[in-house]
Protein backbone atom coordinates (compact mmCIF):
# COMPACT_ATOMS: atom_id res chain seq x y z
CA UNK A 1 0.00 0.00 0.00
CA UNK A 2 1.95 3.00 -1.28
CA UNK A 3 -0.12 5.48 0.70
CA UNK A 4 1.29 4.10 3.94
CA UNK A 5 4.92 3.84 2.82
CA UNK A 6 7.22 6.12 4.78
CA UNK A 7 10.90 6.96 4.33
CA UNK A 8 11.94 3.53 5.52
CA UNK A 9 10.25 2.13 2.41
CA UNK A 10 8.40 -0.44 4.46
CA UNK A 11 4.88 -0.97 3.10
CA UNK A 12 2.26 -0.53 5.76
CA UNK A 13 4.50 1.49 8.09
CA UNK A 14 2.66 4.40 9.64
CA UNK A 15 4.01 7.93 9.61
CA UNK A 16 5.12 9.28 12.97
CA UNK A 17 2.39 11.89 12.97
CA UNK A 18 -1.37 11.46 13.22
CA UNK A 19 -3.65 13.49 11.04
CA UNK A 20 -6.18 15.52 12.93
CA UNK A 21 -9.51 15.53 11.18
CA UNK A 22 -12.37 17.65 12.32
CA UNK A 23 -15.60 16.01 11.30
CA UNK A 24 -18.69 18.14 11.05
CA UNK A 25 -21.85 16.27 10.17
CA UNK A 26 -25.24 17.69 9.47
CA UNK A 27 -28.19 16.39 7.54
CA UNK A 28 -31.15 18.07 5.96
CA UNK A 29 -33.43 17.32 3.06
CA UNK A 30 -35.53 19.60 0.93
CA UNK A 31 -38.37 18.70 -1.42
CA UNK A 32 -37.31 21.41 -3.86
CA UNK A 33 -39.58 23.33 -6.20
CA UNK A 34 -40.67 20.58 -8.58
CA UNK A 35 -41.84 17.65 -6.46
CA UNK A 36 -44.66 17.47 -3.97
CA UNK A 37 -42.95 15.01 -1.61
CA UNK A 38 -39.45 14.18 -0.47
CA UNK A 39 -38.11 10.68 -1.13
CA UNK A 40 -34.72 11.15 0.59
CA UNK A 41 -33.43 9.49 3.71
CA UNK A 42 -30.21 10.06 5.58
CA UNK A 43 -28.36 8.44 8.44
CA UNK A 44 -25.96 10.06 10.88
CA UNK A 45 -24.62 7.38 13.23
CA UNK A 46 -21.65 9.00 14.96
CA UNK A 47 -21.20 6.04 17.34
CA UNK A 48 -20.51 3.80 14.34
CA UNK A 49 -18.87 6.47 12.18
CA UNK A 50 -21.44 5.90 9.42
CA UNK A 51 -22.97 8.75 7.47
CA UNK A 52 -25.13 8.26 4.38
CA UNK A 53 -27.77 9.66 2.09
CA UNK A 54 -30.25 7.65 0.04
CA UNK A 55 -32.23 9.41 -2.69
CA UNK A 56 -35.36 7.41 -3.40
CA UNK A 57 -37.13 7.09 -6.74
CA UNK A 58 -40.23 5.42 -8.04
CA UNK A 59 -43.03 7.63 -6.82
CA UNK A 60 -43.49 9.05 -3.34
CA UNK A 61 -44.52 5.86 -1.57
CA UNK A 62 -41.94 3.73 -3.34
CA UNK A 63 -39.01 6.13 -3.29
CA UNK A 64 -39.47 7.15 0.32
CA UNK A 65 -39.85 3.51 1.35
CA UNK A 66 -36.78 2.39 -0.63
CA UNK A 67 -34.52 5.12 0.75
CA UNK A 68 -35.63 4.53 4.35
CA UNK A 69 -35.20 0.77 3.95
CA UNK A 70 -31.74 1.27 2.44
CA UNK A 71 -30.53 3.47 5.31
CA UNK A 72 -31.85 1.00 7.89
CA UNK A 73 -30.41 -2.12 6.23
CA UNK A 74 -26.99 -0.57 5.57
CA UNK A 75 -26.77 0.60 9.19
CA UNK A 76 -27.64 -2.85 10.57
CA UNK A 77 -25.33 -4.78 8.22
CA UNK A 78 -22.40 -2.42 8.86
CA UNK A 79 -22.94 -2.52 12.64
CA UNK A 80 -22.93 -6.36 12.61
CA UNK A 81 -19.90 -6.49 10.34
CA UNK A 82 -17.87 -4.00 12.33
CA UNK A 83 -18.54 -5.96 15.54
CA UNK A 84 -16.75 -8.91 13.91
CA UNK A 85 -13.58 -6.88 13.25
CA UNK A 86 -12.66 -7.06 16.93
CA UNK A 87 -11.06 -10.51 16.66
CA UNK A 88 -9.45 -9.97 13.26
CA UNK A 89 -5.83 -8.98 12.63
CA UNK A 90 -5.58 -5.24 11.95
CA UNK A 91 -3.85 -5.76 8.59
CA UNK A 92 -7.04 -7.40 7.26
CA UNK A 93 -9.37 -4.56 8.24
CA UNK A 94 -9.25 -2.60 4.96
CA UNK A 95 -10.44 -5.56 2.90
CA UNK A 96 -12.92 -6.60 5.58
CA UNK A 97 -14.46 -3.13 5.75
CA UNK A 98 -14.74 -2.98 1.95
CA UNK A 99 -16.52 -6.34 2.04
CA UNK A 100 -18.85 -5.16 4.82
CA UNK A 101 -19.84 -2.07 2.84
CA UNK A 102 -20.35 -4.07 -0.35
CA UNK A 103 -22.47 -6.59 1.54
CA UNK A 104 -24.55 -3.79 3.07
CA UNK A 105 -25.35 -2.29 -0.35
CA UNK A 106 -26.12 -5.72 -1.82
CA UNK A 107 -28.37 -6.63 1.10
CA UNK A 108 -30.24 -3.32 0.86
CA UNK A 109 -30.72 -3.80 -2.89
CA UNK A 110 -32.02 -7.35 -2.47
CA UNK A 111 -34.47 -6.35 0.27
CA UNK A 112 -35.79 -3.40 -1.73
CA UNK A 113 -36.25 -5.61 -4.80
CA UNK A 114 -38.01 -8.33 -2.77
CA UNK A 115 -40.33 -5.78 -1.16
CA UNK A 116 -41.24 -4.33 -4.57
CA UNK A 117 -42.04 -7.83 -5.86
CA UNK A 118 -44.34 -8.54 -2.90
CA UNK A 119 -46.17 -5.20 -2.96
CA UNK A 120 -47.23 -4.07 -6.44
CA UNK A 121 -47.83 -0.51 -5.21
CA UNK A 122 -44.05 -0.29 -4.66
CA UNK A 123 -43.14 -1.69 -8.10
CA UNK A 124 -40.28 0.27 -9.65
CA UNK A 125 -39.03 1.74 -6.39
CA UNK A 126 -35.32 2.21 -5.90
CA UNK A 127 -32.75 4.47 -4.33
CA UNK A 128 -29.25 5.79 -4.67
CA UNK A 129 -26.81 5.24 -1.82
CA UNK A 130 -23.78 7.32 -0.99
CA UNK A 131 -22.11 7.07 2.38
CA UNK A 132 -18.89 7.00 4.29
CA UNK A 133 -17.74 4.86 7.18
CA UNK A 134 -14.95 6.28 9.32
CA UNK A 135 -12.78 3.74 11.11
CA UNK A 136 -9.53 4.73 12.73
CA UNK A 137 -7.80 7.28 10.53
CA UNK A 138 -9.58 6.23 7.34
CA UNK A 139 -12.84 6.80 5.57
CA UNK A 140 -14.44 4.13 3.39
CA UNK A 141 -17.02 5.11 0.78
CA UNK A 142 -20.05 3.08 -0.27
CA UNK A 143 -21.69 4.36 -3.46
CA UNK A 144 -24.46 3.24 -5.80
CA UNK A 145 -26.18 5.57 -8.25
CA UNK A 146 -25.80 9.26 -8.96
CA UNK A 147 -25.79 10.88 -5.52
CA UNK A 148 -22.27 12.20 -5.05
CA UNK A 149 -19.67 12.29 -2.29
CA UNK A 150 -17.39 15.31 -2.04
CA UNK A 151 -14.32 16.11 0.04
CA UNK A 152 -14.35 19.65 1.38
CA UNK A 153 -10.88 20.98 2.08
CA UNK A 154 -9.73 24.57 2.28
CA UNK A 155 -13.06 25.83 1.02
CA UNK A 156 -12.82 23.69 -2.11
CA UNK A 157 -15.01 20.72 -3.04
CA UNK A 158 -13.52 17.68 -4.77
CA UNK A 159 -15.86 15.02 -6.14
CA UNK A 160 -14.90 11.57 -4.82
CA UNK A 161 -17.43 9.40 -6.64
CA UNK A 162 -18.47 8.88 -10.24
CA UNK A 163 -22.12 8.72 -11.21
CA UNK A 164 -23.46 5.27 -12.01
CA UNK A 165 -25.63 6.33 -14.93
CA UNK A 166 -25.98 5.67 -18.64
CA UNK A 167 -25.01 9.27 -19.39
CA UNK A 168 -21.81 9.08 -17.34
CA UNK A 169 -20.88 5.76 -18.98
CA UNK A 170 -21.22 7.40 -22.40
CA UNK A 171 -19.07 10.35 -21.30
CA UNK A 172 -16.40 8.03 -19.84
CA UNK A 173 -16.37 6.02 -23.09
CA UNK A 174 -15.84 9.24 -25.07
CA UNK A 175 -19.16 8.85 -26.90
CA UNK A 176 -20.66 12.03 -25.43
CA UNK A 177 -19.27 15.20 -23.90
CA UNK A 178 -20.38 16.82 -20.66
CA UNK A 179 -21.87 19.76 -22.53
Task: Kindly give the residue locations of the regions a language model identified.
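PP2C/PPM-type serine/threonine phosphatase catalytic domain
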Residues: 9-179
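Intrinsic-disorder-associated, low-complexity terminal segments enriched in Asp/Asn/His/Tyr and depleted
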Residues: 1-4, 17
Amino acid sequence: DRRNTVQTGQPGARPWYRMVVRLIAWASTDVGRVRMANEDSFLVDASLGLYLVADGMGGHAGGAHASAMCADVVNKVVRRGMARLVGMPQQTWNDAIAEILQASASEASARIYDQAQMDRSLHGMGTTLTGILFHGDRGYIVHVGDSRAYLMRGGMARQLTSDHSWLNEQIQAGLLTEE
